[in-house]
Amino acid sequence: ITMTKIELCETGSTISNCLNPINITTGNGATADIASVEAGVTAATVADFGKATLGKTYTYIQTTMSRAMTITGTAGDCKTEAGTNGSLGAAAGGAADGHTGTAGSAILYVPHFTQDTANYSMMEGSNADGSSLASLATVRTTDTHFRSRQILTSPYTPVAGSSPTVFLAFDTSVAVKELDDDDCTDAGLQAAPPTVTITIQGQ
């Protein structure tokens, strides 16, 4: 996955609104192979929590990520086919063809969809820098990235002289979604954003 912007959200934020976001991105972000990294090993350095404002309390993190994800995976009986990629704006949410053979590396896309606040109030489509935002819970065919919010396991208040350790646990078990069925009879493979648990220690 490619993360291009990381922001912390102050107390009062919700899953659908990042209050007074502060940009803590390191450089231009980073690409991380999260599925192959062993526990406790650094996948990429994407944020500097030292950029947070002292004395402020933060309860959510907001991440801007590319819709394109390079994945080798399976959904039901349908597997990613090497070199058979999805797209930003094609029909069926930009889904890719799969096959029942050996899973290979393919580029899948987080799908485009019209407003769905029941399931996706934590995200909206955007550009790489988190600008040109789509409406809440909407990803447009032209959006190259999406912005997503996640609650911290506990509030974070930066203190002078403190260097917190930030743990991000990624669950990629549902990284591939089959749009219509699991027996691979149609074009239906899409990327599903990984579930992330964020813990900050050493405050």
Regions picked out by a protein language model, each given a short descriptive name:
Residues 1-203:
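A short, solvent-exposed, low-complexity linear motif enriched for acidic/polar residues
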